[in-house]
Amino acid sequence: MEPLDFTGRGVVVTGGTRGIGAAIAAAFLAAGARVLVCGRTPPSSVVPDFVPADVRDPAQAAALVAAAVDRFGRLDVVVNNAGGAPSAVAASASPRLHAKIVELNLVAPLHVAQAANTVMKQQPGGGVIIMVGSVSGTRPSPGSAAYGAAKAGLHHLATSLAAEWAPAVRVNSVVPGPVAGDGSLRLDPAAVARTVPLGRPATPAEVADVCLLLASPLASYVTGAAVAVHGGGEWPGYLEDLRGPTADRST
């Protein structure tokens, strides 16, 4: 069987109506999966099956999983993609804003994962849960401290769930760097080329491809891992740049 053929598989993508989430949903759909996406507002374009859900509410997270099982008969893959945060200076941001950021980016994925595990652990073949993190959780994140802390916590959550829920359920993280067109930030192409070794941001489809890999039999022994999709990271500004002309790195 083709390892990236998801025909007959049931997949849920939270925050799957735009940006990276929409690309992930489209990739699984193209691979033959039946896909259910959720968001707090309806999508503006045609997408796979959609249900409105605010996954910060554990009851709505459970209802999302139940809706998937009702449609597909089983649930094979959950991609916890919903998240994000506005720019906020840590010294002056309100406690309420910080709490909401952590709730959306850390607590909500736990709600969805708990509901998914209840189903996956009881079905033949188990299942896969993928957390969409961020490089903001791996290095200082000025202007988004609470977001970076939540994403760091999300990776730790994934490793803990991977240990607790093995062998039936595999849990991994995807850790994107700058992504073009995801709507979360405005990228300066020159700054990205100067900072990222590969010389450009990722495309949403490139993040989606890694999700396909982690959900497939090709990653059957991979759990508790964090796969960086960041083009080589970020060249430290205080080190001499040894990489050659910028133009050579963006091709």
Mark where each language-model region is.
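Short C-terminal tail/terminal secondary-structure segment
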Residues: 1-2, 139, 223-251
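Substrate-binding pocket helix/loop in short-chain dehydrogenase/reductase
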Residues: 89-102, 192
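Active-site helix of classical SDR
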Residues: 113, 150, 158
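Alpha-helical segment proximal to the catalytic Tyr-Lys
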Residues: 118, 162-167, 220
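Residue(s) in the substrate-gating loop at a strand-loop-helix junction
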Residues: 134
